[in-house]
Amino acid sequence: MAALRMGKLTTMPTGLIYASISVHVAKEEESKKQLVKPEQLPIYTAPPLQSKYVEEQPGHLQMGFASIRTTTSRYIGWCKGVYVFVKNGIMDTVQFGKDAYVYLKNPPRDFLPKIGVITVSGLAGFISARKGSRFKRIAYPLGLATLGATVCYPVQSVIIAKVAGKKAYATSQQMYEAVKSLWTKNNKKLPEHKEKTKLGSADETETPAETTHNLKHSVPLPAELSSETKTKSTSGATQFMPDPKLMDHGQSHPEDIDMYSTRS
């Protein structure tokens, strides 16, 4: 028993000493890791991480709602346009009715005679085109009624004619531009290489015809003229003297030409 007690007493202090030494060593290692010299600090900052934004892909439900919205937006816009058109038409007709009621409630003195002239002219046109075609039945009454209206209301008819003429001119210009654009597009679609081949073939066909024509009408030169031309050409070749400044004399000088031998 005494031996066991002595063993325990001897082992306990050694264990405590070893634990204290290990703890002290660990603390020293941590302090060494944390401490950094100024020379060891980094000069540049760490580069940022390369991040890329990725958009979230729409799901099936979102795609379904988007397709429904795109398909219904067309019909909604069409219905809205029809509603606005009908609303404006109703408002205009109501306003026209109110103005006509106010005007007819207190009409001017020459209103009834003018209306009578217009109605009589329309009836005259209807009666005159009674036995004619359908076009005459429509055109004659309208034409005579408009003629009576222009006679009774000249200022208003002139204004209406000017406005109608401007609108007709604008529409005719638009139609002309549309037809012109279509015509230019159709002309541009024609292949250009066909035109080039046609031109090349025409030139090829024209050149041999011209050469054959010239050969047929060519006349041979007399012998004297041919000999004269030959002598002229040879004499011109012999009489040609090159410029001494441009000649390569080597180490000699052109002034000392008399001192050189001409033996071959």
UniProtKB/Swiss-Prot annotation:
Residues spanning the membrane: 111-129, 138-155
Transit peptide, residue positions per record: 1-27
Mitochondrial matrix topological domain: 130-137
GO BP term, example: cristae formation
Membrane topology designation: Multi-pass membrane protein
Pfam families (alphabetical): ApoO
Keywords attached to this entry: Membrane, Mitochondrion, Mitochondrion inner membrane, Transit peptide, Transmembrane, Transmembrane helix
Stretches of the chain found on the membrane's Mitochondrial intermembrane side: 28-110, 156-264
Broad class of where this protein is predominantly found: mitochondrion
Highest taxon in the source lineage: Eukaryota
Comp. bias regions, Basic and acidic residues: 189-198, 245-256
Role: Component of the MICOS complex, a large protein complex of the mitochondrial inner membrane that plays crucial roles in the maintenance of crista junctions, inner membrane architecture, and formation of contact sites to the outer membrane. Specifically binds to cardiolipin (in vitro) but not to the precursor lipid phosphatidylglycerol. Plays a crucial role in crista junction formation and mitochondrial function.
UniProt record similarity statement: Belongs to the apolipoprotein O/MICOS complex subunit Mic27 family.
Protein name per the record: MICOS complex subunit MIC27
Gene behind the chain: APOL
